[in-house]
UniProtKB/Swiss-Prot annotation:
It is a multi-pass membrane protein. One of its GO terms (cellular component) is cytoplasmic vesicle. Keywords: Cell membrane, Cytoplasmic vesicle, Developmental protein, Membrane, Transmembrane, Transmembrane helix, Wnt signaling pathway. Residues 326-335 have a biased composition (Polar residues). Promotes LRP6 phosphorylation by casein kinases and thereby plays a role in Wnt signaling. May be a membrane scaffold protein involved in the self-aggregation of LRP6 to further enhance its activity. Residues 260-304, 324-360 are annotated as: Disordered. Belongs to the TMEM198 family. The gene is TMEM198. GO terms for biological process: positive regulation of canonical Wnt signaling pathway; Wnt signaling pathway. This is Transmembrane protein 198. Its main location: membrane. The chain crosses the membrane at residues 36-56, 59-79, 93-113, 116-136, 145-165, 177-197, 218-238. The keyword Transmembrane helix applies. Interacts with LRP6.
Length: 360
């Protein structure tokens, strides 16, 4: 019976790491033997970490896509590589291909569905903060089972995810800064200690006894909060100032709501118009409107009549005509010189005074 219990304990619990697992002591220099693929992955992590840390909120869609890709790829890779799929143990390459395909799908969903992307960003923030708490409490607290670190990870992740959905702008800025700083610290850990700090985190999550950290590991661990604080300040004051993806989403939603209301009003008017019976005409056909009085024409000034010499009877002629009627021809000859200034026609009489006067 004790042998059976010891066998089960050996199968369930991880083996205790030896000195070769943790490398050389702090006083001795490490043997750095880099490989091409891990080094390339760490360089890519460093580049993505810079984008996350200092341009996270400005590259909002890209951050959502990369977060979904990271979650989907890691989870599917662990499931495919550790477990048997269709009663077949997949190789690392096949597991990586499947994980990459499903990770791309998860990234697209996180980018297109904003709430899913924000939930994953907040969940990642909570997981990183829980891991940092486990690392910081290593000299003072040793978990007795794996349920303690697991509960801390799940509780912190769900809490930060819900807070990110409630306050997306500040929590997204904080999450991107912390994630970017963690990626940069991981890349630096590979080139400095061959991921010794990463293995330390894994053993803490498994509740396994670990030796105390070296000063190099503590220096890399202190780099994480410093870069996080710097990333938050840079995004708050420089890169993310003036940008608001929340207002863009709200304006789009308001525009859609306004369009829906307009369409509903048009549909209601159309239904009312169709339901309303046609009215009979109360009067006969209307006569065409009578044309109004024409506009008064422009009254022109009459053309002045031109007068010529001889058109007007001279006063001398009128006087001579009167003298003939009265028979005093002598007065007519005497008055003719005095009336010469008022003549407009000929100065002499129109007809000669020959013969006896004619009575008219």
């Amino acid at each position: 019976m004790p042998g059976t219990v010891a066998t089960l304990r050996f199968q369930l619990l991880p083996p205790e790491p030896d000195d070769a697992f943790w490398g050389a002591p702090c006083e001795q220099p490490l043997e750095r033997r880099y490989q091409a693929l891990p080094a390339l992955v760490c360089i890519m992590c460093c580049l993505f970490g810079v984008v996350y840390c200092f341009f996270g909120y400005r590259c909002f869609k890209a951050v959502l896509f990369l977060t979904g890709l990271l979650f989907g790829s890691v989870v599917i890779f662990l499931l495919c590589y550790r477990e048997r799929v269709l009663e077949t143990q997949l190789s690392a390459g096949a597991s990586a291909g499947i994980a990459l395909g499903i990770g791309l799908l998860c990234g697209l969903v996180a980018m297109l569905v904003r709430s899913v992307g924000l939930f994953l960003v907040g969940l990642l923030l909570g997981l990183l903060l829980a891991a940092a708490a486990l690392l910081g409490s290593a000299p003072y607290y040793q978990p007795g089972s794996v349920w303690g670190p697991l509960g801390l990870l799940l509780g912190g992740g769900l809490l930060c995810a819900l807070l990110t959905l409630r306050w997306p702008r500040p929590l997204t800025t904080l999450a991107t800064a912390v994630t970017g700083a963690a990626l940069i610290a991981t890349a630096a850990d590979y080139f400095a200690e061959l991921l010794l700090l990463g293995r330390y985190v894994v053993e803490r999550l498994r509740a396994a006894p670990v030796p105390p950290l070296c000063w190099r590991s503590w220096a890399l661990l202190a780099l994480w909060p410093l870069l996080s604080l710097m990333g938050v300040l840079v995004q708050w004051r420089v890169t993310a100032e003036g940008d608001s993806h929340t207002e863009v989403v709200i304006s789009r939603q308001r525009r859609r709501v306004q369009l829906m209301r307009i369409r509903q009003q048009e549909d209601r008017k159309e239904k009312r118009r169709k339901k309303r019976p046609p009215r009979a005409p109360l009067r006969g056909p209307r006569a065409p409107p009578r044309p109004g009085p024409p506009d008064p024409a422009y009254r022109r000034r009459p053309v002045p009549i031109k007068r010529f010499n001889g058109d007007v009877l001279s006063p001398s002629y009128i006087q001579s005509f009167r003298d003939r009627q009265t028979g005093s021809s002598l007065s007519s000859f005497m008055a003719s010189p005095t009336d010469a200034d008022y003549e407009y026609g000929s100065r002499g009489p129109l007809t000669a005074c020959s013969g006896p006067p004619v009575r008219v």
